[in-house]
Amino acid sequence: MKRRTFLSFLAYSATFTHLIGKQAYIFQNSERAKALSDAGNVLLLLQKQKKNVISLVLQGRKFKRNVDHHYPHPKGVHDESSGYRVFFHGHRNGEYGHFHTFIYHPKGYTHLLMISLDKSGMPIMMSTLNQWVTNDVHLDEQEMIEAYSNFSMDPGLFPDKRSYYFLSYLLKGYKTEIITLMKERTLALRSYFDINGKNPDTDEKLEILSSFHIHTSDLGV
């Protein structure tokens, strides 16, 4: 009798664990869908106003495709309270421009993600970069994931709050993909070291460590 009771308990526990896991999966998917939908809604609203995310950060200024020209301000937007910084510029082939996101910490600052846009302001790719690109301080995989997961800035620091909300929704919605990017970044660094016997941080032939393409259908636009 005791054995039967114990086996029943195990079966119940397994079923309960499965249900909890399934509910967590559904919650994560619904959270993802909402965040990406919110990002898409920002884009759709801007389209109706004949604007886009790029026009929000340019604020009527002429866009100069130059690595040294940053928008919306010369030093971008820096939230000293949270330690995060964002700026937009353009200079790479295959895109119109991109946002850089950074975290400032006791060791210095570290680049988190590059978010590439096409000319219409639609997001097309997210990437992690080699150190020489932004001359930053290396953080390990777990530190990168933690810094990304805590991304938060004061929307009032942006000339138009919608540009911040768009970035925030996008980063939240693609959490699974971004964490994978961070892991692939680690693998790329290890692979380079195994092959070349040195770190890749100063190798200017290696710019992007990991990336994934964004499908605007995810955003409902």
Positions of predicted regions on the chain:
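N-terminal export signals
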Residues: 5-24
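Metal-centered catalytic cores of metalloenzymes
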Residues: 23-221
